Regions:
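Cytosolic juxtamembrane helix and N-cap/initiation of the first transmembrane helix
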Residues: 2-35
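Hydrophobic alpha-helical membrane segments
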Residues: 96-111, 130-135
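Membrane-helix boundary connector in multi-pass membrane proteins
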Residues: 108-126, 143-144
Length: 155
């Protein structure tokens, strides 16, 4: 005898790699979305941060403010994207793979830019390696989750 109720899709437990990937995306999003503060930060504060980092006086003119605000806005957008991707890492898997690979390429560009621009050694030693760590973790977890998903469907 069949049930008169419609069939519901079985809910499989979320694999550990997918849960970990979602958390990495959330933490990445939480960190990068804070760049939104710099979009609205007074220029005087930007100058103070510039000096505090040992970079001397901030340059005068609109280009410094424009670049600081637009780069900060892009980081904040990236943070929002990470939050969205964390809501369904299986469905957004291909996008997560793209973002992780793009971030790895971005880390290489950051390293070159940081060195060429003469950024402080501590900055150079932290920025690009941090991006490599987070994006590498994202990519590794995505690969593990995808492999486990493939193994589960082949059973």
């Amino acid at each position: 005898m069949t049930s008169p109720l419609p069939r519901t899709r079985e809910r499989r437990p979320v694999p550990r790699a997918e849960r970990a990937l979602a958390w990495v995306l959330r933490v990445n999003g939480a960190v990068t979305v804070t760049a939104l503060l710099a979009v609205f930060m007074p220029v005087g504060w930007m100058g103070a941060v510039h000096a505090r980092l040992g970079l001397g006086a901030a340059p005068d003119g609109p280009m410094f403010e424009y670049l600081a605000r637009t780069v900060s806005a892009l980081y904040a957008i990236h943070g929002g994207l990470c939050f969205v991707l964390s809501t369904d890492v299986r469905r957004f898997g291909p996008v997560i793979t793209y973002v992780a690979c793009a971030e790895l390429a971005f880390a290489a560009a950051l390293l070159l830019i940081d060195v060429k621009a003469g950024m402080p050694a501590a900055w150079v030693m932290v920025e690009a390696p941090a991006v490599v760590f987070v994006s590498g973790l994202m990519l590794g977890l995505r690969i593990v989750a995808r492999r486990r998903e493939r193994d589960a469907t082949s059973d």
